[in-house]
């Protein structure tokens, strides 16, 4: 199963993601996200890893 998130906020070493379908918020370390992410980036979460859409 895969989910699509949008990065909405960066606060120090952490990011806030919003899941597109449910609107659920996720607070995650930037180190777990791909290089080059910024506010507004769409991310695919699949097989326990994030990739830029």
What are these regions, as identified by a protein language model?
Residues 1-11:
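Structural detector for short beta-strands of small beta-barrel domains
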């Amino acid at each position: 199963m895969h989910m699509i998130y949008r990065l909405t906020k960066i606060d120090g070493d952490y990011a806030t993601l919003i899941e597109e379908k449910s609107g659920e918020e996720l607070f995650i370390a930037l180190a777990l996200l791909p290089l080059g992410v910024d506010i507004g980036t769409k991310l695919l979460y699949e097989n326990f890893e994030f990739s830029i859409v």
